[in-house]
Amino acid sequence: MNAPIDLVRSQLDAGGLLAEAVSRTGGLTAFGDGPYREALDVMCASLIDEAGLSERGAAMMREKLVGQLVNRLVVEDYFRRHPEIADIAIDDPLVIVGLPRTGTTLLQRLLAVDPRFHTAAWWETRYPAPLAGETLAEPAVRIARAQAEVATMIDCIPQILTIHPLDAMLADEEFMLMEHSFVCAMDSYANVPRYTAWLAWQDLTPVYTYLKRMLQFLQWQKARRGVAPATRWLLKTPQHLHALDVLCRVFPRAQVVLTHRDPAQTIPSMASMAHTLWQMYADDPDPLAVGAQWNAGMARAIGAAMAARDALPAGRFLDVRFEDTVSNPLGVAEAVYAFAGMPLDARRRTAMADWMARNGRDKRAAHDYSIARFGFTDAQLARDFAAYRARHLRAAG
């Protein structure tokens, strides 16, 4: 049942969210740079008018947005008190990019076995800023909260593990860091077509400059916890498909591993995952709306990625087939290391083999869904993604 509109409006008033964040931080007022306020205004209006939030969903969304605003305030306060954070050089991440369900998580976590990579665990992306009652050296409160949230999500939506292997302590996507810009894919969580249309026209440079700022802050915290310095960051999120050109401009020595799989095997599964997330915030989200929006969004993302690929030096990219990642993950890892110019010795290869023995895809249940439920047909998917299939699936061989 949808929450009363007046309740949603009071919960998600943008000015009220900002004021609450200031109050929770004891009067901090510097939210940092970027168009976060305009983005927040558009996002909140769309959530209020279009998302059909339940009472629980509206309350959860309020906490999500206030928490992100609080993080912005705390992050800026740390940069003010420790200006050396801004001097941390992060310009050469190894970035795994592809549609969801193309083996990106498996590949990221396999490579993350190597301590030469800095990665962001789920708890770090969910709670990037210290909370009351903990120290930089011992982030126990954040870890406990993140573990409790993951456990709650699994209890409420057990099928989520068939879609994405959630674990608060393992490497995950930096998407939750990017969300702090408020220029992000809110349609991952709710039906916000007006916001999504606005987002399609935005310059995403501020998203990536803020992502770099967040990574600098996380790396600085890792040093405070005694984590050994790494060679480079390992990043991964499908959202980078929309902005490979911006990514490579903000991180000028980034190298990109592009993962490939037939969109007919990925887009419907992704719509199913999005529908699962929408159910956390709305009682009866329309699966057809989910399917239409994600099909259109991923078609735009793939088109943008193909255009960026044409404009950027070919040597910045490595193509990897999903089938190879599943059937020969260590062979794919070796190819990635060669591409990255990093040696892979026997000790590290053995560590990866041990990790695969414990965490292969065969350890997870299959994701069961109907493509028709989300309005897809095989013919439509073949038509909408014909250019990608003709070009990149063959090129990845």
Q: Residue ranges of each PLM-predicted region?
A:
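Short His-Asn-centered micro-motif
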Residues: V97-L99, L234-P238, F322
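Post-Walker A helix-loop "phosphate-sensing" segment adjacent to the P-loop in P-loop NTPases
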Residues: V113-W123
